[in-house]
Amino acid sequence: MTGSSDIDLLVVVVEKWSNLRVGVTWIEGRMGDLLFATTSEVESISDADLALDANEWVRRVAAFLASTRILVDQGGRLVRAQRAAQQWPDAAFAPTRSDAYRAWHKINYDRQHNRRMLASDDSDYVTALDVRLLYGLNDVLTGYFAIRRERWEGEKAAVRNLREHDPAFLELLRRCLAEQDRHAKFTLYEQLCQEATAPAGGLWANQPTSAHLRDPGTATPEAHAAATAFVQSLVRGK
């Protein structure tokens, strides 16, 4: 832990507080990120049958428990859940194929919109594009990991991961973040989009039409191309 580190805490609560998810506070001068889970959610991690159908939040709690240090555990509930979580396959904590498809589609969809706005002379559009690029780069970064079916563990962990495994992408991201010229920044942004989406088929062709498939399980590049061609035929009246 460094001087600027925060503290992540999992707090187990009774069902009365089941609507709690996260909180923030300060603990001895450090920022504290709080995650809340109910007793039943924690117990479900230890139940093999329930674990198979764990929802996204329970999977997040299980992932946290698998590598954390337990400070207080009345009744041994957390120890049992931790031991169970440590036996879960890595795939249980990884983004799903649906997550990967949604990330690929979103990066492509946003890029199409952003290209259109970049070509506008309207000052409102230009300012809107600047805003979109602010959060768009975050979407590209999180999408990079979702497309590769790697669990998102926060920005700091992402930077460390990229430094070790893909320093070229990290350098490109840093250049894009620092770039002040809008057109130069957009060129770097498109390069990031291409690199992030490469394992899923890359960027859409520079065409005006695309489609989003309902079932990610069938969302192969070929299926996406066929659906896009169908949508295009409707627009053209064929």
PLM regions and their residue ranges:
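Short secondary-structure boundary segments
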Residues: 1-3, 9-13, 19, 77-95, ...
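Catalytic metal-binding acidic patch
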Residues: 1-39
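Short aromatic-enriched loop/helix-cap "lid" or pocket-rim segments at secondary-structure transitions
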Residues: 2-3, 46-48, 157-158
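Short secondary-structure boundary micro-motifs
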Residues: 6-10, 19, 54, 128, ...
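Conserved NTP/Mg2+-binding pocket subregion across the NTase superfamily
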Residues: 23, 27-123
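Conserved nucleotidyltransferase catalytic core and NTase-mimicking acidic/glycine-rich helix/loop elements
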Residues: 89-238
